[in-house]
Swiss-Prot record:
Keyword flag Transcription: no
Sites where the protein binds ATP: K246
Record organism: Albidiferax ferrireducens (strain ATCC BAA-621 / DSM 15236 / T118)
Function: Catalyzes the attachment of glutamate to tRNA(Glu) in a two-step reaction: glutamate is first activated by ATP to form Glu-AMP and then transferred to the acceptor end of tRNA(Glu).
GO cellular component, one term: cytosol
Source species taxonomy: Bacteria, Pseudomonadati, Pseudomonadota, Betaproteobacteria, Burkholderiales
Protein name: Glutamate--tRNA ligase
Locus of motif 'KMSKS' region: 243-247
Amino acid sequence: MTQKTRTRFAPSPTGFIHLGNIRSALYPWAFARSTGGDFILRIEDTDLDRSTQAAVDVIIESMSWLGLDYDEGPFYQMQRMDRYKTVLAELQAAGHVYPCYMSVAELDALRDAQMAAKEKPRYDGTWRPAPGKTLPPIPEGVKPVLRFKNPLGGSVVWDDKVKGRIEISNDELDDLVIARPDGTPTYNFCVVVDDLDMAITHVIRGDDHVNNTPRQINIFKALGQEPPVYAHLPTVLNEQGEKMSKRNGAKPVTQYRDEGYLPDAMVNYLARLGWSHGDDEIFSRAQFLQWFNLDHLGRSAAQFDEAKLRWVNAQHLKIMSDDALAPLVQAQLQKRGIQADERLPRICALFKDRCDTTVVLADWAAAFYADITLNPAEVSQHVTDAIKPALNLLSEKLASCSWDKLSIAAAIKEVLVACAIKMPLLAMPVRVLVMGSAHTPSLDAVLELCEREKVLTRLRSE
């Protein structure tokens, strides 16, 4: 019987979550969904000085907005301390763990000496017990750390689903601290216990964790367990070619929501930051899940490009249904104190092809519900004294005609004939006065969606 796929996203709640972080949630989520497996959310909150509940809330909010639903969790490492200590005691009883009383000053001196000798800094095993070895006397009043007995000799080998075969000599790995002097277990140990208890089959994470993997595999084997399959994702770079990080100006995921990006567009764009399906650039969430597999994950670093993200978002705006789009535009309008009405889906249909975010679409929609600010340069260019008689005549005809697209188009045509002018000469000033811009969709369609009194008031404003 094939084992059910179980993946996880295990962020540390030490600040906001950016696109590089959330991509590490997207791929394990997609792999679980595409294989009928489970996706688990685990909060690695053992850094008590930096972890906050507010950061946890933002992680969950960001995942919810993007539709990255999880089947189990969130599990919190700080709530699992008793379990870690139980497993730690088992390792200690089996002889895989030993106390180390080396002070920070001694460790610093060792590191300095190794660096002076141009050696790789590493713990030298002073307190590691061995047959026939005499350990130093235990210092009084010193609480030891607990170190894991890394195997001597041999190598750690795994078939990484992104990077291929990786082999690390055990001689490169020193004896890892797995419990602090106060008994609190450390990151690499907690991760192994969590992945075992949660039956994780595939660990899909950033390649900044590659160096942790051989240490974790050795702990798995000391516990008599097989490690999961690993896939280490290449780094996401910012537009300057640096690793995306908070320090390098990365924005919170939720800021993209506020700036008018669509969840499906974000998933589409993020999916392409390290994975591909032929030349397909625009695809639905369902298509992504149908196509996704670990074999198509790229090995090279992926560079974020906000202009490309806006283009992807524009494509998704075009194909999104107007009824689904309207509430998102309404949310943007509400931030401006504007309440839309039943016309909003039709407004979305009329303007969405010229927009790349819901904020830009809301800019257009706002003109139908709130006062507009005229552009003096456009007014000066298009609303000339010569065209004002035609504008006055149009106002008269629009005041008495039926308020539908055909009747409005007929009124405009009557003015063009009566004044012997071409359409652009009339349409441009009408657009400027009614919508605040000389460039809009079809004039009769725009006027039909605008209230008659609003149109007449704006036409008579100059």
